[in-house]
């Protein structure tokens, strides 16, 4: 009987401890380590948004399709938003695609469609990415285990 009482008391207090735990993901900045370039790299990361053990991740793309350097902090334009399997710029990527929201005439050339942005208008978290481009289009991404929820605001 005493063991049962102790178990109930322990269970009661342990749930209170878990209820007070902080949401640590709010402190994660996925832009950390993105100040990389081919000559000298400071982290070799890109601001990936994805679920743990997901099929793929999602990221803003400042580099060209097919290059390993998907995102570089010093670059001030976005060429698209891409699905990725890449774990490091040195490993490159495979079976990826990118897209770019726009208005007006369709522009397929990634250099011509690149749009300027400011890091002041960018939020990069593991579970959410948002950027407002200088042309006024806002892109938001929230990952799932097999894809991503996208929202474009014009």
Where do the language-model regions lie?
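Accessory carbohydrate-recognition regions in carbohydrate-active enzymes
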Residues: 20-154
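Sec-dependent N-terminal signal peptides
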Residues: 4-13
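Sec/Tat signal peptide C-region and signal peptidase I cleavage site
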Residues: 15-19
């Amino acid at each position: 009987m005493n063991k049962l009482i102790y178990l109930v008391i322990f269970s009661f207090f342990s749930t209170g401890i878990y209820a007070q735990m902080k949401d640590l993901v709010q402190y994660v900045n996925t832009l950390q380590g993105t100040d990389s370039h081919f000559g000298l790299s400071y982290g070799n990361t890109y601001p990936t948004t994805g679920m743990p053990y997901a099929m793929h991740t999602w990221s803003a793309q400042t580099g060209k399709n097919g290059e390993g350097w998907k995102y570089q902090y010093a670059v001030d334009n976005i060429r698209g938003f891409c699905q990725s399997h890449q774990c490091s710029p040195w490993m490159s990527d495979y079976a990826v695609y990118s897209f770019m929201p726009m208005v007006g005439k369709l522009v397929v050339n990634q250099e011509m469609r690149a749009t300027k942005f400011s890091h002041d208008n960018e939020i990069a978290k593991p579970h959410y990415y948002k950027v407002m481009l200088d042309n006024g289009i806002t892109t938001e991404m929230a990952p799932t285990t097999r894809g991503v929820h996208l929202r474009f605001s014009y």
